[in-house]
C-alpha cells in the first residue's frame, strides 16, 4: 500500500502536466479519477509501454493503489459523478476489497488465515502470499513486500 496517502498516483510513471496542474485524486469525483486513470494509461501507451496484456502500465490511485475505481464505486451504489475519491470513499472501497477477499468468512472461521491472506494478495499487490511471493510479482509493475500472516494469526487469537 502507499502509506495511506489518499491523493497519490502510481509513481512508476509521472505525467508532469498532471502534477503541474495540481491535481489531487482526493478532491476529484470518481468519474474524474476514472477519466484521469484512462488518460494516464493512454499516455503510457503513447510513450511505448504497450504490452499486449497491459502489464507494463498502471494508473493505480489513492492510499490503496486502486485500479477499477469506477466499477467498484458503481457496484457499491455510489453516484460516480458526485462521490469524491476522498479518504472516506477510499476506506469504504478498501473494505469492499477486504470483503471480496473473504474477510467475513475469515472472521467467522470459515476460511483459514492462509486462504484469506492469499486472497488479499490478489486484491492488494503489496501483500505476499503465504508462499512468500506476491500474486502480481513478475508483471513488470509490482513486487509484494508485506507479510501479513503474523498479523492475521495475532488477530485470530
Segments predicted by a language model, with ranges:
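Cell-wall polysaccharide-cleaving catalytic domain and substrate-binding groove, primarily
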Residues: 1-84, 89-157
Amino acid at each position: 500500500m502507499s502509506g495511506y496517502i489518499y491523493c497519490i498516483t502510481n509513481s512508476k510513471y509521472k505525467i508532469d502536466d498532471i502534477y503541474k496542474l495540481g491535481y489531487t485524486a482526493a478532491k476529484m469525483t470518481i468519474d474524474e479519477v476514472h477519466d484521469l486513470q484512462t488518460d494516464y494509461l493512454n499516455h503510457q501507451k503513447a510513450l511505448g509501454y504497450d504490452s499486449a496484456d497491459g502489464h507494463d502500465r498502471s494508473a493505480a490511485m489513492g492510499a490503496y493503489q486502486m485500479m477499477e475505481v469506477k466499477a467498484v464505486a458503481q457496484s457499491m451504489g455510489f453516484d460516480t459523478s458526485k462521490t469524491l475519491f476522498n479518504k472516506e470513499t477510499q476506506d469504504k472501497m478498501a473494505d469492499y476489497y477486504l470483503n471480496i477477499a473473504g474477510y467475513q468468512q475469515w472472521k467467522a472461521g470459515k476460511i483459514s488465515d492462509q486462504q484469506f491472506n492469499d486472497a488479499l494478495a490478489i486484491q492488494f499487490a503489496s501483500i505476499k502470499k503465504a508462499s512468500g511471493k506476491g500474486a502480481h510479482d513478475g508483471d513488470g509493475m509490482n513486487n509484494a513486500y508485506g507479510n501479513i500472516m503474523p498479523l492475521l494469526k495475532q488477530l485470530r487469537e
